[in-house]
């Protein structure tokens, strides 16, 4: 079995405007091993988010191959891809996507409850991860009662609570001030390292990208070093 957590070969993605094909990704090759931290940078509209969605099984490619833990996902149905995502991956987005009517504890426990974990055990795991991200004192607060940095920390906790093999992060600090962005980014690197998980992060900030183990540039539909 391959040691790669995520890999893709000759990955291609096009969209269509009527009969006109608009290519976005034109032959991406990428391997993400266990514990790797990879930053992907590129101009707005270069296809960074599209690539991340494909790597996470949230979209299907026009051509090429994607494997998550050696499972080829192109031939999977949506239910099978969803199960693989929930079991193997964590996601963090620029906007936290926390459910506003639920507390931080309830939001972070949600992925475990979706897995049908017992409520008490799910809450125990969520509480532990929230303490790790510095929110042990904010368990009963809703997203509206948290600061921007705290909401993003809760989103990081939610991504890590399932102990994923890899976290995919799409501009996770893009909505934060520079100091808070640096703190959240450092926290993600630290927690992923401690958990032995891989991290693929899309960012427009070259200073943050340089903290990753590997930085790749997406331009003209291709990844370069």
Curated annotation (Swiss-Prot):
SUPFAM superfamilies: P-loop containing nucleoside triphosphate hydrolases. GO terms for cellular component: plasma membrane. Its EC number is 7.6.2.-. One of its GO terms (molecular function) is ATP hydrolysis activity. One of its GO terms (biological process) is lipoprotein localization to outer membrane. Residues 6-225 form the ABC transporter domain. This is Lipoprotein-releasing system ATP-binding protein LolD. The lineage of its organism: Bacteria, Pseudomonadati, Pseudomonadota, Betaproteobacteria, Nitrosomonadales. The gene is lolD.
């Amino acid at each position: 079995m391959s040691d790669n957590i995520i890999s893709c070969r000759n990955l291609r993605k096009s969209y269509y405007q009527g009969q006109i094909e608009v290519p976005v990704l034109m032959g991406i090759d990428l391997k993400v091993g266990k514990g790797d931290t990879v930053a992907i940078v590129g101009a707005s509209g270069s296809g960074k988010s599209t690539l991340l969605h494909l790597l996470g099984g949230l979209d299907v490619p026009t051509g090429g191959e994607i494997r998550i833990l050696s499972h080829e996902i192109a031939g999977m149905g949506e239910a099978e891809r969803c199960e693989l995502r929930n079991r193997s991956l964590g996601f963090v987005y620029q906007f936290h996507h926390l459910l506003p009517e639920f507390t931080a504890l309830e939001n972070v426990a949600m992925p475990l409850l979706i897995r049908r974990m017992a409520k008490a055990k799910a809450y125990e795991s969520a509480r532990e991860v929230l303490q790790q991200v510095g929110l042990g004192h904010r368990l009963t607060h809703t997203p509206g009662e948290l600061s921007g940095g705290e909401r993003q920390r809760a989103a990081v906790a939610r991504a890590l609570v399932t102990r994923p093999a890899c976290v995919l992060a799409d501009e996770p600090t893009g909505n934060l001030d520079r100091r808070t962005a640096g703190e959240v980014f450092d926290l993600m690197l630290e927690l992923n390292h401690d958990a032995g998980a891989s991290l693929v992060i899309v960012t427009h900030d070259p200073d943050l990208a340089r903290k990753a183990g590997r930085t790749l540039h997406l331009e003209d539909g291709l990844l370069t070093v």
